[in-house]
Amino acid sequence: MKNTQTNGTHPIIDKKPNGTLNGDHQEYPTFSQEKLDDSIKRGIDLQVFRYPSTGINVLIAGAGLGGITCALECWRKGHNVRIIDRSPSPVWTGDNVQIQPSAILLLRHWPDMGYEIEENQYDVDMSYYRQTGERIWGPAPPMFNDPEHLPGRRGFPSVNAHSRIKLYRAFLKQAERVGIYVEWGCKVVEYWEDVEGHAGGVVLENGEKRTADIVVAADGLRTKSMTIVPGMPDQLTTSGKAIYRAGYPVEHALKDPTVREMWNFKPEDKPIWQFWLGNGSHNMMCLTHDLAFWSFIHSHAESASESWIPDIDPAEVITEMEKNDAVHPAIAALIRTAPKGSVVNWQLKFRDPHEQWTSPGGHVVQLGDAAHAFLPTSGNGATQAIEDGVTLATCLQLAGKAQAANATKVYNKLRFQRVSCGQKMGFVNQQLKQHTDWDAIMKNPALIRSRYPKWVWSHDPEAYAYEKFAEALTHVVSGGRVPLVNTNFPKGHKYRHWTMKEVQEQIKAGQKLEDLQDGDWS
């Protein structure tokens, strides 16, 4: 990848690739004793080490977190990478994003990016309240940071909460450090593959064609790859829910006397993260040293859109909240502090799990939301997209150019069951907060905590791909005659296909989703 700009790129930094060890050119920088000690103590690479070239050409369509992760890891694993995106420039909107430890592991190989993200993340404890103001539980860290889970953990810390804008900027900057520049304004209208020619490709809106050994569809829920992936549901299904969400400078919130009185928050204090639960809905609020975030998940309304255009009046949010339950005055006050142009109302749509993420020949492969939709209550969508990128790049490295098309199928087999179980956890958390069993919670308030299962956060996607690749490849090339036994989802669980409609009917019938699952989902 040449370190040059092309039409449509919008560089975040203006630097040449940093000193990397890539088999061709080696630089040996000096490091401070402090950095050397930290590298040894926490298991963080001193610099980015690039593996020898595989000769595999990878084209990634979609420069979200999953797509950028895939680009970075494909570069690190020795592949040739290009990345395009339909947006005319980077999208600097969004509020907060949750990243679990299994995805944070990636940063140990990208130290500059890791230190930047570590500096900007929000170390939050979580509390849970009723809309009356009654505290249920907390403050306490997310489950994966309970004291008993911390010994032996290495790499950068995972504290769960990040500014989406800061996190995304760090990923883009790291890509540019190694010479990967996103080509913006490239809208894909069609995917194709030529099995005999061992290639996949895309057609852009302007009629231009791009081709590569492997094409990664990382272009979101409405991916155009659905026409080339067998068995993929054509339509997205509404979940019946939508989410108001906002993020803006914290000084707007702290100007309000009711907000100041309720939370007594100062920018130098530890961030506050609270869930407020009502009748069939819930909202989240967070105050940090520089930003305020809040969200409210509610029953689907016609005003909800599929656009991130922040054009919602905060008064609309309060009106919608009052349909379910009385709104605490402090929550209403906080919502009113959102400045114009900061609030979105986003439909929560879902696509039932589909087992195949590749084109028939394997030259086109889906990643992130294009392969699997997550509800925000899972706190897991971005994490799984990052895991996807790590896994796919590793499978391509192990397969080599001759088996690259089979590598995408291996990636698919390693990921599907895990991701499908993760998707179901979004409904578990939704039921917990919107169909709360208050009798059980009053007996044991800790049961209200958001579920962050150990089988999710303790996973190492790179190590798992190295461990399972040969077994999975044999499974693929044998046409499934040789079994593959995945171990990256709940222990003891026997996977079976499920649908959103089935889960919603179970919730409506008053059945607890957690109690219906076999195996250990904790």
Swiss-Prot record:
Keyword Ribosomal protein found: no
Cofactor: FAD
Active site per the UniProt annotation: R245
Binding site for FAD: R164, D369, A382
Enzyme Commission number(s): 1.-.-.-
Protein name (record): FAD-dependent monooxygenase fsr3
Pathway assigned in UniProt: Polyketide biosynthesis
Disruption of the gene: reported phenotype: Leads to an alteration in the product spectrum, with an accumulation of fusarubinaldehyde.
PANTHER family, A to Z: FAD-DEPENDENT MONOOXYGENASE MDPD (PTHR13789:SF315), MONOOXYGENASE (PTHR13789)
Induction field: Expression is repressed under acidic conditions, while the expression is induced under alkaline conditions. Expression is induced in presence of sodium nitrate, and repressed by glutamine.
Cited InterPro entries: FAD-bd, FAD-dep_Monooxygenase_BioMet, FAD/NAD-bd_sf
Function description: FAD-dependent monooxygenase; part of the gene cluster that mediates the biosynthesis of fusarubins, highly pigmented naphthoquinones responsible for the coloration of the fruiting bodies. The non-reducing polyketide synthase FSR1 is responsible for the condensation of seven acetyl-CoA units to yield a haptaketide. After rings A and B are formed by aldol-type cyclization, the PKS-derived product is released as 6-O-demethylfusarubinaldehyde.
Record Pfam families: FAD_binding_3 (PF01494)
Lineage summary: Eukaryota, Fungi, Dikarya, Ascomycota, Pezizomycotina
Entry keywords, A to Z: FAD, Flavoprotein, Monooxygenase, Oxidoreductase
Region feature Disordered, mapped onto this chain: 1-27
Family from the record: Belongs to the paxM FAD-dependent monooxygenase family.
GO MF term list: FAD binding; monooxygenase activity
